[in-house]
Amino acid sequence: MDSINQKILLDLPDGIELFIKREDKLHPIISGNKFRKLKYNIQEAKRLGHTTLLTFGGAFSNHILAVAGAGAEFGFKTIGIIRGEELENKIAENPTLAKAQELGMQFHFVSRTAYRDKEEKMFVNHLHELFGNFYMIPEGGTNELAIKGCEEILTDTDKVYFTHVACAVGTGGTISGLINSSGQNQQIIGFSSLKGAFLSDVIRNFVVKTNWNINDSYHFGGYGKVNDELIQFLN
């Protein structure tokens, strides 16, 4: 399945064209890179005989909502481990969690301190004690299978026509897929949601090409943060 390349009409220097790839049109809920990241994970969960998907995220996580949507569409029970306990009794006040719950997701709220240990064996074992057997998808959805899905974002035409491909970077999965599938003469540019060089190290675990770079000048303090400069740009 391919998305649509929509031309953006801006006053740009001669010879430069800007397009946005409408990955959000792939699915009404499992949209954008989430569709790509979950595609092969869903297939693997089915192959292994799992009936439950478990994943992690914050209260406004698009990934949480996408997994809930995938579960509803493909017949999986879904469990979301949510960072922070402040909304445990106020789910209806949060549109992301409310929609995920409507789609059948069960929530388990944990403190931010406990959440930092989410990938530790002891923490995962405790989750198995609570919820039994499940197929675990990491926070943000990034793993080898997710990257395989993201390698399908660029079509053969895209790899020839576009000289530069830019995307937002959170956990590094989407840009890793773009890098792996990029054309010989393409440059891949990632704009990080977070400050720090750690993302480049994460990406290097998944790619061998060097036609990419990460720009962290526009993180504006990280997820969920805004300042006057960002508000002015949006307006």
Model-derived regions, located:
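PLP-dependent amino-acid enzyme catalytic core
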Residues: 1-235
